[in-house]
């Protein structure tokens, strides 16, 4: 989900498998709690990722498994294409806390959500990123009336550096009622994600490109009158 606490700060390094422009990268994060777009999804979690890149195309598998007994499990697949400052994406978002949420169910009861997105980096001198995501399919994509919601999310964010610390600040909004997706109540436009991220990575000497990082995310959700402080470790290969 899209989304990724450490990935917002630390890029995934490419590893040895390179052939005709194809490369692979991966890693895992350990987080004190898992928040997606300002909304709590689970407690402490392990979040692995694997990316294959070929030219301007990339395919990423990302997951999250809760350490507690809540049963929360997530598996996302994202296909992305970068066209200059614009990145277009299609993602299959699958998360479940119930035994009857079967992965290979794609009918009206499907626990999957199919989301399309677009992100635009304004310029190198002004590295603001404007992003829009909309869910097109999924049983849970409903508004308070039970109608298809086409749940959408808009975010404006900007990375910057303070001495040797990588920072990122931004705000995320929901433009219309998406009660079943974001659990922020029966309302239309609202701000649900105001965040400030900070992190730093180090190379592991003698480990052939391995990196370790530490990050913190301060998250406000005005729609829920909530605030959270998340910390974690990032491992990249």
Regions found by a protein language model. Name each.
Residues 14-67:
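Short glycine/proline- and aromatic-enriched beta-strand/turn motifs that initiate or cap beta-hairpins
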Residues 14-23, 56, 85, 89, ...:
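Short loop/turn motifs that connect adjacent beta-strands in outer-membrane beta-barrel proteins
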Residues 22, 42-46, 71-75, 110-114, ...:
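Residues that define the transmembrane beta-barrel architecture of outer-membrane proteins
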Residues 25-31, 51, 60-64, 80, ...:
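Transmembrane beta-strands of outer-membrane beta-barrel proteins
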Residues 31-37, 57, 62-70, 93-102, ...:
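Sequence/structural signature of outer-membrane beta-barrel proteins
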Residues 48-50, 77-79, 116-118, 154-156, ...:
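Membrane-embedded beta-strands of outer-membrane beta-barrel proteins
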Residues 107-179:
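Detector for outer-membrane/organellar transmembrane beta-barrel domains
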Residues 158-160, 196, 202, 225-237:
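Outer-membrane beta-barrel "beta-signal"
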């Amino acid at each position: 989900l899209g989304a990724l606490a450490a990935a917002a700060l630390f890029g995934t390094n490419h590893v040895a498998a390179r052939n005709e422009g194809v490369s692979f990268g991966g890693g895992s994060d350990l987080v004190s709690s898992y928040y997606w777009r300002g909304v709590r999804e689970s407690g402490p979690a392990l979040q692995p990722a694997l990316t294959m890149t070929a030219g301007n195309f990339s395919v990423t598998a990302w997951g999250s498994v809760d350490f507690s007994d809540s049963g929360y499990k997530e598996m996302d697949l994202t296909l992305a294409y970068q066209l200059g400052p614009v990145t277009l994406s299609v993602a299959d978002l699958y998360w479940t806390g119930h035994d009857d949420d079967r992965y290979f169910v794609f009918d009206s009861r499907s626990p999957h959500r199919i989301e399309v997105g677009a992100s635009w980096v304004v310029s190198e001198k002004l590295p603001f990123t404007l992003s829009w995501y909309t869910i097109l399919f999924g049983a849970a994509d409903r508004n308070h009336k039970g109608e298809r919601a086409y749940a959408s999310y808009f975010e404006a964010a900007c990375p910057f550096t303070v001495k040797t610390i990588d920072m990122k600040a931004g705000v995320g909004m929901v433009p219309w009622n998406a009660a079943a997706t974001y659990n922020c109540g029966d309302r239309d436009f609202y701000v649900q994600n105001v965040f400030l991220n900070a992190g730093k990575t180090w190379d592991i000497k003698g480990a052939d490109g391995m990196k370790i990082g530490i990050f913190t995310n301060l998250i406000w959700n005005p729609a829920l009158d909530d605030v959270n402080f998340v910390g974690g470790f990032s491992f990249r290969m």
